[in-house]
Amino acid sequence: MKINLKYISFTRVYQSLLLSILIYNNPINSEAQDNHYWAQQYGATCTLMGGSMIGGVNDNSAIYYNPGILGFIDNPSLSVDANVYRMDRVMITDGAGKDMNLNSAQLSVYPQIIAGMVNLLKKSKFRFSYTMLTRNHGNILMNARYASGGSGSGNPEVTSFVGGFDYVNQLNEQWFGVGAGYRISEKFGAGATLFGTYRGQSYQLTNYVQEVENIDSRNVFRTQTIDEAIKYSNYHLIGKFGLSYTSGAFKLGATLTTPSVRLFGSGNVQRENSTITVSEDPSDMQNNFLIMDRKTDEKAVYRHPLSIAAGIEYFTPKTRLSVTAEYFFRTDPYYLLKPASVPFVYPTSYSDSADYKPMIDSYMHVEIATRPVLNAGIGFSREIYKNLTILLGASTDFSSYEDTKEANEMLSGFGSFDIYHLATGFSYSLVKQSVTLGFTYAFSPSENIPPYTVINQGPAADEAHLSSYSYGIILGYTYYFSRSGE
């Protein structure tokens, strides 16, 4: 019997029934956000302008986009921007077999950013800022069930057949930052932000098929099961450095974001894969197989990549047009979790097999790698009435997922589909405050993929159809305490 922990299947010679389950050599972003660096933007105005604010951000979200601009912000202010409502939808047609769709539709409400400015030194060229922002947030929940009896199957030999697929992937990443900017001259500024970050992810996949068949007046029970779960948390430090320059009607900016420096982190991982037959005839059970293990409080390592960004903005008293691009470098393969693997294996002969020992030794490993990504965004704003401004934005959000020998596509939010973001809204400004309201839409072009699993009987699906989209409402409020020097 050949065991393949990427894809397990068995075919019954006496009946054209294929039971197959796709499993991964390591457990699973989330929603797509886990592989997408531009899934979140910050500040209502910046979000609705496609995040294209490296060159011309003029509110306290500069602590994230470009701390080199902080020295030019004269209004110390407290800003609270939130995704009041967001719906994320992932659809995989035939994802669990022919006519067995996998769908997830989740509502989220969470703070996008809370940020403020502080003038510690009056009439100084220094400006200080602080922030708390949601860097990543994702939630996918999918399940599918299939059941049939002997009469419904069209074959009197089959007594019953049951299949199930349950998938949960939740991600939460929070960044806490303090930043400082210095106005070197009336045109040139520099700044830096230090972020302390928390990242937590919880993933669970349960996939099984069960069959009871009557053969020659005896019942034969067959089952295949995949059960795997990961839960981890990581704490890091990340630095961002920024430069800004103004020349006439143009603003330019550039930033560098350092790779993360791990402080500490831990996680749990458990897995089970089995193919079991129970029968009065020993020959039916010769291919039985079971492997399982569980590890807790293991060292967990997650890495954020080095990135560089540049942006330019053209501005007039009533109009802004901005463009930004950011390049994220590759991260070489590394282990999110790499516990010593000493699983229970049956038959025990597999433990001593040269063919299967490497697979068994790496059974609990969770490997990650990211490919380089270049994202770009464009934003436009125009005052259309007294203090009322329309905002428009668009941006790319390409996937960084890279398949490796021990990678788990499911842990990474279904792999490598790209996302495109569109946004529009309005901002209304008063002397001491401003309010911004807008809408966002994100989508992934549909693509054909192999089915993630097969939990039903009948003709097998050759391919599945993956698509996703997201709707959001952005509400921003900024209160200006006083201008510098007032």
What residues fall within each predicted segment?
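Short secondary-structure transition/capping motifs
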Residues: 21, 101-106, 166-169
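N-terminal, post-signal peptide beta-strand-biased segments of exported outer-membrane/organellar beta-barrel
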Residues: 28-134, 260, 415-417, 443
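Outer-membrane beta-barrel porins/channels
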Residues: 33-47, 111, 117-486
